[in-house]
Amino acid sequence: MRRELMKMKINVDKSLIKAVKTGKVIIGANRTVDAAENGSAKMVVLASNCPADIKKKVQETNVPVLEYEGTSVELGPVCGKPFTIAAMAILDAGESDILAATA
């Protein structure tokens, strides 16, 4: 079972990398909430340690939410960024299959 979880996490990580490189994403809690509220986000990715108020605001919208198992410290480098990412919105997945993660 643990191996299955590791494989799944690796696939999510690869999908996130591909979405960042080939699609259009918004990084940052406030901008992510705005994208979710105005309907431009196709999916929101929240780090496991994302602040509760941000989670609540996003979950009040109809946008699918992917709760990333890692922390914001881990999510940043996965996306190729040298900073933490607590929340990000996927506007266009590009060549990534990340949108299937919540299907």
Curated annotation (Swiss-Prot):
SUPFAM superfamilies: L30e-like (SSF55315)
A GO BP entry: translation
This protein's record includes keyword Ribonucleoprotein: yes
Coiled coil: none
Keywords: Ribonucleoprotein, Ribosomal protein
GO cellular component terms listed in the entry, alphabetical order: cytosolic large ribosomal subunit
Pfam families reported for this sequence: Ribosomal_L7Ae (PF01248)
Gene Ontology MF term list: RNA binding; structural constituent of ribosome
HAMAP family, A to Z: Ribosomal_eL30
PANTHER family membership: RIBOSOMAL PROTEIN L30
Family: Belongs to the eukaryotic ribosomal protein eL30 family.
Protein's name in the database: Large ribosomal subunit protein eL30
Lineage: Archaea, Methanobacteriati, Methanobacteriota, Stenosarchaea group, Methanomicrobia
